[in-house]
């Protein structure tokens, strides 16, 4: 009998609960890089309109377009969490994963030498923890089958911001 596989998780983002404090960015960069380096954070908060903060991270698409686009197989899927994992030694920073991603989530921070994508911190995302501790709860771990709707969440930050601004302000920009 094979080892039991953990149910796959993803991070549900509720932008209207985001204060824009960016503790998630700080915590993520400390967890992954050992320093405060928001540019290398696997989650980013965008404020394209005043007062509308949009946390943005990988939704772990079930068809993994970024993984499939990588010419060097630097991206793989963690068997336990279903998260995309980057092999920094194989990454040639070509940007194929960025182009393939519907949300344009992967980034190549200056000085990093490889792409960064959310790996769900091995199943215990630190950004979700700090957001909860700060009392915002804009980020939440969810499980289950979201295949029918995942493209709803896999949008670029500008598109998400425009959607929210239309709802808040009731007009097009």
Swiss-Prot record:
InterPro entries associated with the record: 4Fe4S_Fe-S-bd (IPR017896), 4Fe4S_Fe_S_CS (IPR017900), RnfB_subfamily (IPR050294)
Record localization: Cytoplasm
Binding residues annotated for [4Fe-4S] cluster 2, in chain numbering: 28, 118, 121, 127
Cofactor note: Binds 4 [4Fe-4S] clusters per subunit.
Cellular-component GO terms for this entry: cytoplasm
S-S bridge residues: none
Residues the record lists as binding [4Fe-4S] cluster 4: 70, 91, 94, 97
All residue ranges annotated as the 4Fe-4S ferredoxin-type domain in the record: 9-40, 48-80, 82-111
Subunit-level organization: Heterodimer composed of a small WOR5-S subunit, with four [4Fe-4S] clusters, and a large WOR5-L subunit, containing the active site tungsto-bispyranopterin cofactor as well as another [4Fe-4S] cluster.
Protein name: Aliphatic sulfonate oxidoreductase, polyferredoxin-like subunit
Source organism of this protein record: Pyrococcus furiosus (strain ATCC 43587 / DSM 3638 / JCM 8422 / Vc1)
């Amino acid at each position: 009998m094979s080892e039991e596989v953990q149910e796959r998780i993803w991070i549900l983002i509720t932008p209207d609960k985001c204060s824009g404090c960016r503790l998630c960015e700080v915590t993520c960069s400390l967890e992954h890089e050992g320093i405060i380096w928001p540019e290398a954070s696997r989650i980013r908060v965008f404020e394209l309109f005043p007062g509308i903060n949009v946390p943005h991270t990988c939704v772990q698409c079930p068809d993994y377009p970024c993984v499939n686009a990588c010419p060097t197989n630097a991206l793989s899927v963690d068997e336990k969490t279903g998260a995309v994992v980057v092999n920094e030694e194989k990454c040639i920073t070509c940007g194929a994963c960025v182009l393939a991603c519907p949300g344009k989530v992967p980034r190549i921070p200056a000085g990093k030498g490889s792409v960064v994508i959310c790996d769900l911190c091995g199943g215990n995302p630190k950004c979700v923890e700090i957001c909860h501790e700060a009392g915002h709860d804009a980020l939440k771990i969810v499980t289950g089958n979201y295949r029918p709707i995942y493209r709803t969440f896999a949008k670029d930050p500008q598109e998400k911001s425009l959607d929210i601004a239309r709802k808040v302000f009731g007009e097009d920009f």
